[in-house]
């Protein structure tokens, strides 16, 4: 039996790297409100840790017909099923979630070792994404692939790179969606300089990359097992100011059609092939579980460059070494009644809600 738990505060926990980490209120609320999500991909007989089993059942029934095949359990019930657990599947692995699970009575032999968690944290640093981006561009040698990112360890070095870019984006090496990111227009002001200095002090450095005129967000989802990395499907998603808003729920062919005006299907095939191999080279034997690679279509800002569609593709904006909302969308898209709809996460001022809406409705 697999035990599932939704810990969306994972990205922030990685930045703190402290088993006693307490997430901010928003993270705790998101975890409580959407803790039923693993029911969408859990197998028959699996258990899911939730805050309120009755509420979880009600919410899960909105999205799946056979929710009774999985079992929602409270934290108090975990110790009762500990001997049945063969595998634990969180949203993402970090030292805090391991500590929480051990306190609930999960046997240590079904949890990753501290060394494995350290490796996962290292690979979750945005430096790894930048390294894979560089390798992918070198391997594919396509003129319409773009993207560069640099890791710097001081404010003077950061200012030098920003000066060469003009408009730039700086990112904390470990941070969650929409957080830990600042946009720079020509030069850093005092507030951003102070923020960047804190990031460098706490995390050892900071990422800096040029600002791109983004046209469309998309990504690729993968799963890693003992055999290696396997492609799971495309993700066409939507963000506002860098924060996730929602996903298109469609078949793989339909998502390819959405991207066709910007990215030729043959390019997608080559990207998938090369990226799968690169990820396999880096991750096999070091990580098992889901992951996602965020990408984007970029406007052609270089009129001298000839691109088949008139657009560029940034193939590795970041690598999320965890489950993503793209994986959630893939699970929902298997239900025919949700296809041609949009998956959306809303906050009403008190609670988070997962909805599916008609594509005609705006985010």
Language-model-derived ranges and their functions:
Residues 133, 162-183, 204-214, 293, ...:
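ATP-grasp fold ATP-binding core
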Residues 231, 244-311, 350-362:
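A long amphipathic alpha-helix within ATP-dependent nucleotide-binding catalytic cores
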Residues 166, 192-245, 296-300, 306-316:
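Phosphate-binding site of ATP-dependent enzymes
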Residues 1-44:
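N-terminal-proximal low-complexity accessory segments that begin disordered
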Residues 44-46, 50, 340-363:
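C-terminal amphipathic "assembly/sorting" segment characterized by alternating charged
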Residues 148-149, 168-192, 219, 241-259:
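Glycine-rich phosphate-binding loop of ATP-grasp-fold ATP-dependent ligases
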Residues 222-277, 320-346:
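ATP-dependent carboxylate/phosphate-activation module, predominantly the ATP-grasp catalytic core
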Residues 28-37, 49-157:
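Conserved N-proximal alpha/beta basic substrate-recognition cap immediately N-terminal to
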